[in-house]
Amino acid sequence: MLPPCYNFLKEQHCQKASTQREAEAAVKPLLAPHHVVAVIQEIQLLAAVGEILLLEWLAEVVKLPSRYCC
């Protein structure tokens, strides 16, 4: 999981840079493994929260027919 996520972050940082030198400077912070791990953990947390919200929404959708049925 680390290499694809790292490449994605690298692309995002490089797209914001207008020159090769700026791109290299933007990528330097990404070379620290703790930065990559922190970003991955943040993404996983957001995904977990999103999954919980989706499950709550689905539970409400399932209840709807019983509310409006006979």
From Swiss-Prot:
InterPro entries xref list: Protein_14_SARS-like (IPR035113)
Entry's Gene Ontology molecular function annotations: identical protein binding
Pfam families in UniProt: bCoV_Orf14
Name of this chain's protein: Uncharacterized protein 14
Lineage of source species: Viruses, Riboviria, Orthornavirae, Pisuviricota, Pisoniviricetes
